[in-house]
């Protein structure tokens, strides 16, 4: 996994790999790190969710984006509707262009 070797840089903790991406992907990574990493797992931004129990992680924290790929449309659906069926994710945690940027970031890096 190429992202595993990425080094965090700057005060935002964005990896050098992400820093070379278009501005919307960089912004999406920053927003994901700030607003989503408390519950979701994604190694490229150092997000691990809240539980260390791998068997419980997805049920408690939501999708593990290290292994689950999502399309931008699916990400936007989850953001607008508080996740998928039965989810406990806050609805509209990001909106407008911010939501689009998170969707662009996740569709590029999730499931890699």
Residue positions per predicted region:
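Hydrophobic pocket/interface hotspot
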Residues: 28, 102
């Amino acid at each position: 996994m190429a992202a595993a070797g990425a080094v965090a840089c700057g005060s935002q903790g964005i990896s050098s790999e992400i820093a070379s991406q278009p501005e919307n992907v960089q912004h999406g990574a920053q927003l994901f790190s700030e607003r989503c990493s408390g519950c979701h797992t994604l190694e490229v931004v150092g997000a691990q969710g809240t539980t260390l129990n791998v068997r419980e992680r997805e049920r408690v924290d939501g999708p593990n984006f290290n292994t689950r790929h999502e399309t931008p449309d699916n990400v936007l659906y989850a953001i607008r509707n508080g996740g998928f069926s039965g989810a406990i994710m806050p609805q509209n945690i990001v909106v407008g262009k911010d939501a689009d940027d998170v969707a662009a970031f996740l569709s590029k890096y999730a499931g890699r």
